[in-house]
Amino acid sequence: MQNINPTQTAAWSALEQHKADNLNIPQLFAEDANRFDKYHLNFEQQILVDFSKNAINQKTLELLRQLANECGLASATEAMFSGQKINRTENRAVLHTALRNRSNTPVLVDGKDVMPEVNAVLAKMKDFCERIISGSWKGYTGKAITDVINIGIGGSDLGPYMVTEALRPYKNHLNMHFVSNVDGTHIAEVLKKVNPETTLVLVASKTFTTQETMTNALTAREWLLAAVKDESAVAKHFAALSTNAKEVAKFGIDTANMFEFWDWVGGRYSLWSAIGLSIALSLGFENFEALLSGAHAMDNHFRTAPIEKNIPTTLALIGIWNSNFLGAETEALLPYDQYLHRFAAYFQQGNMESNGKFVGRDGSPVTHQTGPIVWGEPGTNGQHAFYQLIHQGTKLIPCDFIAPAQTHNPVGDHHAKLLSNFFAQTEALAFGKSKETVEAEFVAAGKNLADVAEIVPFKVFTGNKPTNSILVQKITPFTLGALIAMYEHKIFVQGVIFNIYSFDQWGVELGKQLANRILPELQNAEKISSHDSSTNGLINQFKAWR
């Protein structure tokens, strides 16, 4: 990948000047009755992305596309797909796209085609899923598996949990449970719900040394052995998603039930790999394959569609415009689908761990904004929580509204009411409500303007708040796969233009290092004085209270 400071490009300078045009969303619509037709894109007639309610015009998009070209987006995209080691700080390729490469076109890393290994793991996952789901796999007392606990953290938890929740209408009889936090409460509450005779535990850790995951895995192992008192039972109730065969065998897991992945799979992009075994178990392997197919279709779109028609690139460029030129610091992901209640949390990690960097690819601090703060909750819940600030606060918060046209649960008029709110919110954010409209409403209600003059300013909405509307025909494994891949590629595009490395995460290391130093200090009653006064005081109070 090239090392290009975006702020030194001609396009960046032109965008800085263009910012002075102070584009206004209501005015842009007033000037162009066909604005929607020009500012939306459609993916396979299943996902419609409307970006017309942003403060952009044709000039904005042309300059943003010029910025992408000047920053070498096209060559960076090919570098990723072709297996070049674009994760330079860890000297790794970035090939989550190969995991869902349904075409089987060879993908080379260091001259070796990775697809035979990818397909071998998928075949192994399929066979395992069929045995568990059919009931032919038996636990230590001869009973079939009814519950699956996935123990992992970060990408080994967030992705599988998000997808199994999002696709709950497709789930089979297996009950899925997810444990991530090293807080003993998390695993204790899950173990209360399950029977050791009929429970399968998946331990998801590439190295099989991750502190949180292995602490929880050992607790689950002790729980099983407390019931059966026979170490051979571990092999019938545990499987590993790992690459460390030695540690897996030492734990008591049969390495035949170890599902591998590779160092070119980043944790937050790993649900497509063996880490997705819990997804395949919950939904059935054919639905897992459909998820992969949807992502692969979006990969093909991203790789081949011209920049003017490219959905992930367009979303990425608009995001850069909003953050670096219009001053937005956050992005809200607002799915109007209760099944997608973990979608924002998933891409909170996906975006903030990828692009939350202050050092450019040249090793120097950047002078521009990089990744935004990403957050959100499902609609309509959020409307009664934080939308107040989005509508009338002093922060500019671009929002992505996501909704399915078809619901899995056609109960009464629930879905029509849900979608009426979905459509209304983006209209309200874009167009607001003027002082004149507020006054006219009071008059229509029979009020005397003199009597309500004091209240009028509080009912004004300025509008001009940017949103994208993403309307999905129906949330299926295919469309969810495409939707996830769309956001993955958006993050990639922004990282390329920000001139940062999106696929490392050194920011998680310092806290872990310090925690490893502090842990031994907590295992005695001695007063601590080895840290700053704040940390010493907190540790000593903890010791006094425990």
From Swiss-Prot:
Gene3D superfamilies: 1.10.1390.10, Glucose-6-phosphate isomerase like protein, domain 1. It catalyses: alpha-D-glucose 6-phosphate = beta-D-fructose 6-phosphate. Pfam families: PGI (PF00342). GO terms for cellular component: cytosol. InterPro entries: G6P_Isomerase, G6P_Isomerase_C, Phosphoglucose_isomerase_CS, SIS_dom_sf, SIS_PGI_1, SIS_PGI_2. It is found in: Cytoplasm. GO terms for biological process: gluconeogenesis; glucose 6-phosphate metabolic process; glycolytic process. Disulfide bonds: none annotated. Keywords: Cytoplasm, Gluconeogenesis, Glycolysis, Isomerase. The active site is at residues 353, 384, 512. Its EC number is 5.3.1.9. PANTHER family: GLUCOSE-6-PHOSPHATE ISOMERASE. Belongs to the GPI family. This is Glucose-6-phosphate isomerase. The lineage of its organism: Bacteria, Pseudomonadati, Pseudomonadota, Gammaproteobacteria, Pasteurellales. The gene is pgi.
